[in-house]
Amino acid sequence: MAKAKFERNKPHCNIGTIGHVDHGKTSLTAAITKILAETGGATFTAYDQIDKAPEEKARGITISTAHVEYETQNRHYAHVDCPGHADYVKNMITGAAQMDGAILVVSAADGPMPQTREHILLARQVGVPALVVFLNKCDMVDDPELLELVELEVRELLSKYEFPGDKIPIIKGSALAALEDSDKKLGHDAILELMRNVDEYIPQPERPIDQPFLMPVEDVFSISGRGTVVTGRVERGVIKVGEEIEIVGIRPTQKTTVTGVEMFRKLLDQGQAGDNIGALLRGTKREDVERGQVLCKPGSVKPHTKFKAEAYILTKEEGGRHTPFFTNYRPQFYFRTTDVTGVVHLPEGTEMVMPGDNIAMEVHLIVPIAMEEKLRFAIREGGRTVGAGVVASIIE
């Protein structure tokens, strides 16, 4: 049978399965593709095909991630599933697979476990907007009261990490029953019920092009007789010739007007998310702008020096540090296009951080950088990556 061509006319959404090891994340991923394949919305991908996930590199870190795609009545989905716990931590922190929402898989037989808690915390820290819960292996639990107890536990845990625990949809079912066609209610029907909830409960992400304009500065040239041209890839939004923008980061914020946009040496009337452009800036001197700043819609992004972050520190085998670090550690933080030195303050009770740890920390940069929550960065020492992080909240 020929592979069905995915229609791109449906809104797109990125999701993933998260949860404790062996609670059934990969089985559920396989089950979703199986059930949706019945209506032509997917190609069935078996468990063992998903489980041997290829390795990818993101921000200098190797991560194993499996990708499947499928569609429901309403949306087209790209779905990520990771084989190991460390891969989830790295994936969520580096944003290698951006998640607009996630399906938290909890085994009804075991209830919430340590990684269930850790994945919920990570989802909160890295800014995953919404979770839907699949209570898996319900065919192994005969006592309905026990199921209710597990559901209550999951809701309490979600609320503890500031997700709306009492509102989040929890679907009871069995991925195995769906894969083996053994119990229609817990298998087939539960998967469809899950996808209906994912469709309705996970908000449709705003497309990059609809967000306020932002472009990281990669290079600055001065063109005699024309002025200063700044090049970079537009991260989001649209910039039109004649619009006012701000130059933010490193030094005091400046306002200027874009008097020209070019791409591949051709003049355009606008540049948009994904385009590599050169922007001609009115009355701006070559020395007024530098790599590491951003051009943005006025007032949309502010420069900051202090923030809380969630970070993953590479192991020695991954090319990271061989030794732990302590509070007042001073590496470089690579934001978008440049390194800035910063000082790390560890939370109370954390003496040191070992290679391979993930950690919440406070960072004070020596110069301000245009930043907002969810912005990713690399932690570097002399140009080599020793960690990755994400801005969890801004202090000042």
From Swiss-Prot:
Region entry G5, spans: 174-176
Gene Ontology MF, one: translation elongation factor activity
Cellular compartment(s): Cytoplasm
CC per GO annotation: cytosol
Region (G3): 81-84
Major location category of this protein: cytoplasm
Ribonucleoprotein among keywords: no
Positions with a binding annotation for Mg(2+): T26
Key words, A-Z: Cytoplasm, Elongation factor, GTP-binding, Hydrolase, Magnesium, Metal-binding, Nucleotide-binding, Protein biosynthesis
Residues that hold GTP according to the record: 19-26, 81-85, 136-139
Ranges for domain tr-type G: 10-206
SUPFAM superfamilies, per database record: EF-Tu/eEF-1alpha/eIF2-gamma C-terminal domain, P-loop containing nucleoside triphosphate hydrolases, Translation proteins
Record-linked Gene3D superfamilies: P-loop containing nucleotide triphosphate hydrolases, Translation factors
Keyword Cytoplasm tagged: yes
Xref: Pfam families: GTP_EFTU, GTP_EFTU_D2, GTP_EFTU_D3
Catalytic activity, reaction form: GTP + H2O = GDP + phosphate + H(+)
E.C. no: 3.6.5.3
Region annotated G4, chain positions: 136-139
Region (G1): 19-26
Top-level taxon in the UniProt lineage: Bacteria
Region of interest called G2, as start-end residue ranges on this chain: 60-64
Function: GTP hydrolase that promotes the GTP-dependent binding of aminoacyl-tRNA to the A-site of ribosomes during protein biosynthesis.
Family membership noted in the UniProt record: Belongs to the TRAFAC class translation factor GTPase superfamily. Classic translation factor GTPase family. EF-Tu/EF-1A subfamily.
Subunit architecture: Monomer.
Protein name: Elongation factor Tu
Source organism: Bradyrhizobium sp. (strain ORS 278)
Recorded name of the encoding gene: tuf
